[in-house]
Amino acid sequence: MKTLAHPDAAAEIRTRILTLTPSDASQWGIMTANQMICHVREAYVYALADIPVDFISLPFPPKVVKHFALKLPTPWPHSTTTIPQLKLDAPGMVCTNFDQDRDTLLASFDSFCALTNHTRDHPFFGTMQHSDWMRWGYLHADHHLRQFNH
């Protein structure tokens, strides 16, 4: 399984981010390429921050959702829900220009990849160990890069 704990997988995601262009069209959903990089950036920032997590109620227990999302070799479904802080109209969701936003995404990505013992709760998955976060970090970026055919 690919995870950001493996340098090759982290380099793959970084390269795919660098190949994005502002004119890339979404294969699903409503985001533009620039909005997507802002969303992914803020997801890493949120994961890095020491702020309270508001749990999202799902029809299955968090452990089950986490297992399906992080352990099974299937892509995440299109247009899944997100936490309010990562929605396009969230107060902290500020997109400026594509190149600048991509640079800040790469900075937050690099900070996230540099973590060595990250544990905190996730709004959907509950308790997460460092290995879970590194897997999530890969899968979340991969999901949105595939959204833009990268």
Q: What is each of the regions a protein language model found here?
A:
Residues 11, 102, 119-121:
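A short alpha-helix capping/helix-coil boundary motif
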Residues 12, 39, 104:
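Charged catalytic carboxylate motif
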Residues 23-71, 111, 115, 119-150:
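Short, contiguous alpha-helical
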